[in-house]
Amino acid sequence: MASTYSFDIVSDFDRQELVNAVDQARREIKQRYDLKDTQTEIELEEGSLIITTASEMALNSIRDLLLTKAAKRGLSLKIFDFQPPESAGGNRVRQVVRLKKGIDAALAKQIAKQIRDNFKKVQPSIQGDLVRVSGKDKDELQAVIQMLKQQDYPVALQFVNYR
C-alpha cells in the first residue's frame, strides 16, 4: 500500500476528437443550403484553426456549427479562443481560432493557492504546465477534485495520473 497518493491537474484536449469535429463540420458545410456556395475553408494547424469564408454571417454560422460538433465529440468549448475576424481580400472573411492547451503560471499559482487554503493535508506543486497534488488520504484528494470541478476556470481542467 502506497504511503502517499497523487494526481495531476492538466489542461489538454484529444487532438483526434478535434480532427473528427472539424471533419464533421466540413462535411456539413458542404451539405447545408445556406453554406454550400460560400467556399468555406477550415484549416487545422498545430495550435490553431483558420476559418475562411464569404461573409460575417456565414462565419457566425460556421462558428456555431464547429462548437456544436466539438461539444458532441466531448471536447470542452473552453479550448477555443476566437480572435477577431479580419478581411481576407476579395470580400472574404478570415478568423483565427487559437487552441488553448496547458495551464499558464498565473492560473497554476491560483489553483495551488486555492488548494492550500481549503485543504491543509494535501500539497500542490507546480510542474511546468501541470499542477501535481499529493497527500496521504485518497478521500482528501477526491475532495480537492470535487472542489476544483465546481470552480469556473478559463481553461478546461482534467485530472490524470491518479495513483
UniProtKB/Swiss-Prot annotation:
<dbReference type="InterPro" id="IPR036183">
    <property type="entry name" value="YajQ-like_sf"/>
</dbReference>
<protein>
    <recommendedName>
        <fullName>Nucleotide-binding protein CYA_0935</fullName>
    </recommendedName>
</protein>
<comment type="function">
    <text>Nucleotide-binding protein.</text>
</comment>
<dbReference type="GO" id="GO:0005829">
    <property type="term" value="C:cytosol"/>
</dbReference>
<keyword id="KW-0547">Nucleotide-binding</keyword>
<dbReference type="GO" id="GO:0000166">
    <property type="term" value="F:nucleotide binding"/>
</dbReference>
<comment type="similarity">
    <text>Belongs to the YajQ family.</text>
</comment>
<dbReference type="InterPro" id="IPR007551">
    <property type="entry name" value="DUF520"/>
</dbReference>
<dbReference type="InterPro" id="IPR035570">
    <property type="entry name" value="UPF0234_N"/>
</dbReference>
<dbReference type="InterPro" id="IPR035571">
    <property type="entry name" value="UPF0234-like_C"/>
</dbReference>
<dbReference type="Pfam" id="PF04461">
    <property type="entry name" value="DUF520"/>
</dbReference>
